[in-house]
Amino acid sequence: MTSQEKVPFQVQLSLPQILSRRDWENPQITQYHRLEAHPPFHSWRDVESAQKDRPSPQQQTLNGLWSFSYFTQPEAVPEHWVRCDLAEAKPLPVPANWQLHGYDAPIYTNIQYPIPVNPPRVPDLNPTGCYSRDFTLEPSWLASGKTRIIFDGVSSAFYLWCNGQWVGYSQDSRLPAEFDLTPYLQAGSNRIAVLVLRWSDGSYLEDQDMWRMSGIFRDVKLLHKPEIHLRDIHIMTHLSPEFTSANLEVMAAVNIPSLQLNDPQVTGSYQLRVQLWLADKLVASLQQPLGTQAIDERGPYTDRTQLVLRIDQPLLWSAEQPTLYRAVVSLLNHQQELIEAEAYDVGFRQVAIHQGLLKINGKAVLIRGVNRHEHHPQTGQAIDEESLLQDILLMKQHNFNAVRCSHYPNHPLWYRLCDRYGLYVVDEANIETHGMQPMSRLSDDPSWFSAFSERVTRMVQRDRNHPCIIIWSLGNESGHGATHDALYRWIKTNDPTRPVQYEGGGANTLATDILCPMYARVDEDQPFPAVPKWSIKKWVGLPNESRPLILCEYAHAMGNSFGGFARYWQAFRQYPRLQGGFIWDWVDQSLTHHNDHGQPYWAYGGDFGDTPNDRQFCMNGLVFPDRSPHPSLYEAQCAQQFFQFSLLSTTPLVINITSEYLFRESDNEQLYWRIMLEGESMLEGSQPLNLSPESSQCYRLAEKLPTLNKPGQLWLNVEIRQPKETPWSPAQHRSAWHQWRLPQPLFSPSSDLTNATAHYAPQLQHNLQLQHNRQLQHDLQLQQDEQHIKVTYQQQCWQFSRQTGRLAQWWVADKPMLLRPLQDQFVRAPLDNDIGISEATHIDPNAWVERWKKAGMYQLQQRCLSLHVDHLSHSVQISAEYGYEFEQEPLLHSHWVYRFDRHGRMTIDVNVRIATSLPAPARIGMCCQLADISPTVDWLGLGPHENYPDRQLAAQYGHWSLPLEQMHTAYIFPSENGLRCNTHTLNYGRWTLTGDFHFGISRYSTQQLMVTSHQHLLEPEEGTWLNIDGFHMGVGGDDSWSPSVHIDDILTRETYQYQICWQYKV
């Protein structure tokens, strides 16, 4: 039934009769009486309100508290509920997911369906929510016109009654369901009742990697339209080849009763007018009668018309400069009186694939994208405007220009905000059948064709007026079948202005204009059966392949991950047809739960008693659930930044800056530079940045490098900031940065022996603070007995155990400084990437954690092989050898040489040999538990945020200071975290460590991180745990289910050496 037809008289079926049909188990029944899809309507009754986007009096929200009753299956619902509320009904907010209000449980699964796989059947025990609400209408709404109800999102299927009469049925959780209520309304109070089913045959098409929840989770509203009204509006822009002029094409359809469609006296009495505004300036206007040119031998459309307005020198829309016009479409009667008006933001932009490149307005675009689920930790899938805007601002601030709506059409407001703030959008149909075997089983089944097709066609019909949408997607992980080919052709016919992408079937079928693989690697082929994933460099060079490649998913950001991300961006900038991709994904999909004491925590799969579940696999975000950043977000920001830097010379000091902006000039950018010596500023300056799009410019910063006043590393830091605030960023927002280590001019030390020694022995630079005339005092004392070796200097005493060979205690003024002795450390608390798909019921022998377990890395037995003491003239030296074995097989050999000097320093040289049979260890380092707890940590090295050997592009060498608690990254699933690399000096309380090392420091031991399932369960331990690594394996991140650490970041050598110098300032 079309929206042009009045609801006919129908025999009212009882609730049991309706339910007995089991429409929710018939894929060929997706709706009853649902109106056709169209762009959002407001039905303004004056042009100015439409042009200024004022709230429309013709809309009435039904959001708020509804009456709610919960049942375990639809057949349990009493028949009289359709007419009156049940006694046990409770209030429930709309929009909301009922699982977050004490009914039923949310379920998190990735691939596995949460119900037995028997399509189209679903379980008889099918949780059912019964909603109802009373409302009253303006008397004018009842006097004339049509009143419709709009549900923007209901999961997964629902029936609707109004005043006890059945209205209709709908499924597809992520697109609006709209019904004409006019025949059912009455004066005074009206009651609507909605029966929502958790599972339907549509659930087999909604197998996305997300929390499975139910209810009316998007807005509900009433809309009043005139009897004769605008039924559909399609807006397109066409730019001239030189982009100097454009045509605005508007196709508008009018609702006219079917019996009058062929009456020219009726149809010819209506006119359509389009006005195009730029702010308050009317740019163009056109008015013409209803009707089109003849379409075929039967004639024209009499209920629609096409209007084309020519615009000279249009301001173009892009994510960089999202200039929007406003098109007001008015329906006029024969007296030229306004019947109603609709209005839409219009962006003049062209999307095309030309010569193998995706181009926006003629420019090849580099997609700086991210996948985003609609998720909020408290409200689940019910998202408000504040949350939508928060995500957009964060994305823009961190150099994202694109977002993929994974994996369903989003809330209508999302697209309006992306239009206005500037983000390119891949709009994706609500289709995923990942749990089917094969995935294409349903897409090749004709009985499912209508269910598939409505999810694609209705998405396009709702969203096609948005300039932000540059690509349509047929869905996600649903294989490749005949249905996909048909829907690809439908889109290309109905919207030739946008390309279509679809990853299923290998990312390179005829149903996609873009090669859009997921998790293809930069240089490594993955020759999977049927659907091989070639390296992205290889893929674009395959014979007869000319399409651009944009990764629909890459860089799986699960927990402490994102290693090797910079490699992708090196490739993107090197190979033109590698045009970026969409990171997986934006936000950790954790929900707020409460423990037995009512305290909140972030939960993941299984925490609600949900089965089946995929545990913490829902947490792959660049941001935590509350949108605070993961360290990986900074890595993405830096890799994707729009300015690239190169150092041309040091005398004079000249750099080159290239703008990767395609359309905007750098009219709000200031270049700041600073020459740093060991973290201290030696010379600095700033100047405006004046760069045209896609241009480069040299900047002369200084005539020569500054004269050094002490030895150390010299660095040049540059950054670009925006002096003025923008719609998406505050003033002084940092948008780009870079750093180079400079050649060091010869430092001429004084004749003082201490300075000279420091110059030629950089590892002793921590001693430069000693006054020049300070005299060495007191000799070192050595004491030995059968159990201990003690080295004493002034108030300090180092005590070794002869049994273990370890430094068992460090005394200062008779106070013990160590709670656990200093010892080797070769393991880390496993990362999600280390674990991969390995779990208790499914062991993956290729996972790093399983290889380490099998080798005995977590159960190493240590033996002291030898212990030697030498009392030299100015120092004491203790040499110890340690052997590590598992099941009597030697695996590691560690040789430590401790040197104690008359400055109270302990220098340790460590040499580690690794058996060739042992898998590469996670780290080569040492750890101990310090008795002290200091409020701050101060270091000279890479920072300020967490960084790892394969994730340090965004980190900078400098002098940093942070509170102790900020040295721990609170990943929801605890793991190794908090490392800072390439450190030369660490100060913690009275402790000073120097050398060249990585370190991590926190209140939690590696052992506690290994055995604790959730962040909130971690208990601060006594003292402080200090991890010092000479070497640390990368974290990986190409994906999280197979080993993805690149070979350069794996500890594959047989021997490793490092040196650390410790001192306690008494």
UniProtKB/Swiss-Prot annotation:
Name of the protein in its database record: Beta-galactosidase
SUPFAM superfamilies membership: (Trans)glycosidases, beta-Galactosidase/glucuronidase domain, Galactose mutarotase-like, Galactose-binding domain-like
GO cellular component: beta-galactosidase complex
Catalytic activity of the protein: Hydrolysis of terminal non-reducing beta-D-galactose residues in beta-D-galactosides
InterPro entries in alphabetical order: B-gal_small/dom_5 (IPR004199), Bact_Beta-galactosidase (IPR050347), Beta-gal/glucu_dom_sf (IPR036156), Gal_mutarotase_sf_dom (IPR011013), Galactose-bd-like_sf (IPR008979), GH-type_carb-bd (IPR014718), Glyco_hydro_2 (IPR006101), Glyco_hydro_2_AS (IPR023232)
Gene for this chain: lacZ
Assembly notes: Homotetramer.
Enzyme Commission numbers on file: 3.2.1.23
Superkingdom, taxonomy of origin: Bacteria
Pfam families, A to Z: Bgal_small_N, Glyco_hydro_2, Glyco_hydro_2_C, Glyco_hydro_2_N, LacZ_4
Cofactor(s) needed by this chain: Mg(2+); Na(+)
Residues involved in substrate binding: N110, D209, E477, E553, Y554, A555, H556, N620, W1041
GO biological process: lactose catabolic process
Site (Transition state stabilizer): H373, H407
Gene3D superfamilies documented for this protein: 2.70.98.10, Galactose-binding domain-like, Glycosidases, Immunoglobulins
Residue sites binding Na(+) per the record: D209, F617, N620
Similarity-based family: Belongs to the glycosyl hydrolase 2 family.
Active-site feature positions: E477 (proton donor), E553 (nucleophile)
Organism of this sequence: Yersinia pseudotuberculosis serotype O:1b (strain IP 31758)
Tagged with keyword Transcription regulation: no
UniProt: Mg(2+) 1 binding residues: E432, H434, E477
GO MF annotations in UniProt: beta-galactosidase activity; carbohydrate binding; magnesium ion binding
PANTHER family, per the entry: BETA-GALACTOSIDASE (PTHR46323:SF2)
